[in-house]
């Protein structure tokens, strides 16, 4: 996974990538640390690029996307939010949404 360091980088992704996953985390978040490797393993099964952001380092992204809890997983497709989960990630549901997106491509 690649790190997003600023809001402009995120905007560029929206413009250039058809489909991608964004994982938002915060420092000292034990759930974030536990879920991160699971997200990495899951996304390897698909050909979607994946990015992560430390929500404290990019406050503009946090505000623009209403990312007020962590962890958060958002799937983007065609420049729009397709699916979002926050705090408690339902990996079965996330997998279903990734499958759904993989057939759309």
Question: Residues of each region from the PLM?
Answer:
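Hydrophobic beta-strand anchors of alpha/beta hydrolase catalytic cores
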Residues: 20-22, 50, 73
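CheY-like receiver
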Residues: 12-13, 61-64, 82, 97
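Structural micro-motif
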Residues: 65-74
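N-terminal leader/targeting and pre-domain segments
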Residues: 1-20, 97-99, 103-105
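Thiol-based oxidoreductase modules, predominantly thioredoxin-like and allied folds used
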Residues: 4, 24, 43, 47-60
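Short acidic active-site motifs
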Residues: 6-10, 57-62, 93
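Non-catalytic, surface beta->alpha helical segment in thiol-disulfide oxidoreductase systems
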Residues: 77-105
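Local sequence-structure signature of Cys/Sec-based thiol-disulfide redox active-site neighborhoods
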Residues: 9-41
